[in-house]
Design a protein with these regions (language model features):
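Membrane-interface amphipathic segments in extracytoplasmic regions
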Residues: 1-272
Length: 272
């Protein structure tokens, strides 16, 4: 099985388990910069060199050896389930992707047909009822996660805990897990704990939000998208995320964590 979704600097200073929609573009660019003293020109997800990735066959052996011996600090970054799935909806369902097409070809037409969502027309720029469409998308996302129908869940809305757990189950151990909502604090702790060829000054690092501008702007406060049924669906899908990463399931308007992440608890519960 190995370590899918895992990136590592070429200097082997640090190992990162990617969780989609959790600042991964920015983190990837920081790792790249820490080795090379410059940013990757383009979306870091497209980088085929300069950063070890499990998806590159020539990287798998070095990542595997490092993780199995815990030679470098390993970390990941997590996000509030409410804002994460809302972001996935606007980016992946409503938005036009970097290649000028809809995400995953026939995915969006299928969700439009089967679940009656609207996405703002062919270019994603038209007006539509964002709240009603998002709530219908939630039903679709729940069906993919709970019943694996009409398709398997996509990595952008499958549970964060699922992404985090594969690293543990296959023999890795995290030294740090931090919240997207407290990004600078968490990323700084990682940087303080490692030695890199190039020093990173977080205050000068831009935010590489590669999904920004793909889809329509969110028009309402986060909590307006979640009625009682929506909150029930979100909890059904992301119960472990709320519990293990200490987010408030009862209040969609509070994106901040309400407790401290316990690494021993994470490894015990997600390593089963």
């Amino acid at each position: 099985m190995g370590f899918p979704g895992t990136w590592m600097t070429e200097s082997e200073s640090v190992v990162y388990r990617v969780v989609p929609k959790c600042a991964c573009s920015t983190i990837g660019q920081i790792l790249y910069y820490s080795d090379h003293g410059s940013f990757f020109d383009g979306d870091i997800h497209d980088a085929a060199e300069g950063l070890h990735k499990w998806s590159r066959e020539d990287s798998q052996q070095v990542i595997n050896a490092n993780v199995k011996t815990h030679a470098a600090l390993a970390f990941t970054c997590v996000r509030n389930p409410y804002t994460r799935i809302l972001s996935s909806f606007f980016d992946k369902i409503c938005g036009i992707q970097r290649n000028g097409n809809r995400y995953r070809g026939n995915l969006v037409p299928m969700v439009i047909q089967k679940y009656g969502i609207e996405v703002g027309g062919a270019d994603g720029k038209g007006e539509f009822d964002q709240i009603a469409s998002f709530r219908r998308f939630l039903l679709f996302a729940r069906d993919t996660i709970k019943f694996r129908k009409p398709m398997d869940p996509d990595i952008h809305w499958s549970a964060t805990s699922g992404h985090v757990s594969t690293f543990i189950c296959n023999g890795g151990r995290y030294d740090q897990i931090f919240w997207t909502e407290k990004f600078n604090d968490g990323m700084q702790k990682v940087l303080d704990a490692i030695e890199t060829p190039h020093q990173v000054n977080l205050a000068e690092i831009p935010r590489f939000n590669e999904s920004e501008g793909h889809g329509p702007k969110r028009l309402h406060p986060v909590e307006d998208y979640f009625d009682d049924l929506s909150m029930h669906l979100v909890y059904e899908m992301y119960k472990r995320d709320f519990e293990i990463f200490k987010y408030d399931a009862a209040d969609p308007s509070n994106k901040m964590p309400v407790g401290e992440i316990d690494l021993d608890e994470v490894h015990a519960k997600l390593g089963e």
